[in-house]
Curated annotation (Swiss-Prot):
Family recorded in the similarity comment: Belongs to the thymidylate kinase family.
Known EC number: 2.7.4.9
Keyword presence, Translocase: no
Keyword Transferase: yes
Keyword line: ATP-binding, Kinase, Nucleotide biosynthesis, Nucleotide-binding, Transferase
Protein name: Thymidylate kinase
Catalytic reactions of this protein: dTMP + ATP = dTDP + ADP
Primary role: Phosphorylation of dTMP to form dTDP in both de novo and salvage pathways of dTTP synthesis.
Single biological process term from Gene Ontology: dTDP biosynthetic process
GO molecular function, one term: dTMP kinase activity
Gene3D superfamilies with a match to the protein in the record: P-loop containing nucleotide triphosphate hydrolases
GO cellular component, one term: cytosol
Length: 199
């Protein structure tokens, strides 16, 4: 089983992933915990490039998208697909839905570009995607409490409003796969919401 976790900054994805990871391990299941961009040494190097705040050169939106898919291709081939073939459960902090929300809805890139990349480089989609939804201001306040903000976290509220709208669009198009969780609730309550879809 392949499960991805989506949402804007500071909505509690990491906490939920840890709880679900523990839940499956207590059932004696083998679980692979991973993230995007990242998940392999090479993909983590790309992640560092994507998140770094560079005051000397602005990264173009196309470059950002291509770097994310370079990391994703490596991640799929090296981690996700081998784990699924070994009947392990894969829990991924973000996957392709993040690219639609952040790069298409947030940055304004063409969906055709994303579709082309998905057709050529994404051979497997998650069976379940949890979208943790909370007001943008709440998530950003949580993100600021964690410390220094990365390149994405430094974006304006208007950007994250578009990102959230992107997630909402996907949820309405694919309600069978994408499950919206109310991330304004406590971590335990969010976990209980998620378990209902995994029963």
């Amino acid at each position: 089983m392949f499960i991805s976790f989506e949402g804007t900054e500071g909505v509690g994805k990491t906490t939920l992933i840890r709880k679900i990871h523990q839940h499956f391990e207590e059932q004696g299941k083998q679980v692979v915990l991973t993230r995007e961009p990242g998940g392999t040494p090479l993909a983590e190097q790309i992640r560092s490039m994507l998140l770094a705040v560079n005051h000397d050169e602005n990264m173009s939106h196309d470059t950002e998208l291509l770097l994310i898919y370079a990391a994703r291709a490596q991640h799929l081939q090296q981690v996700i697909l081998p784990a699924l073939e070994s009947n392990k459960i894969v829990l991924s902090d973000r996957f392709t839905d993040a690219s639609f929300a952040y790069q298409c809805s947030g940055r304004g890139l063409s969906q055709d570009k994303l579709q082309l990349l998905n057709q050529n480089f994404v051979s497997r989609m998650p069976e379940v995607t949890f979208w943790l939804d909370a007001p943008i201001e709440l998530g950003m306040n949580r993100a600021r409490e964690r410390g220094a903000l990365d390149r994405f976290e430094q974006e304006k509220l208007s950007f994250f409003t578009k990102v959230r709208e992107g997630y909402e669009t996907l949820w309405k198009v694919e309600p069978e796969r994408i499950k919206r969780l109310d991330a304004t609730q406590s971590p335990d309550q969010v976990f209980e919401q998620a378990l209902q879809y995994l029963a």
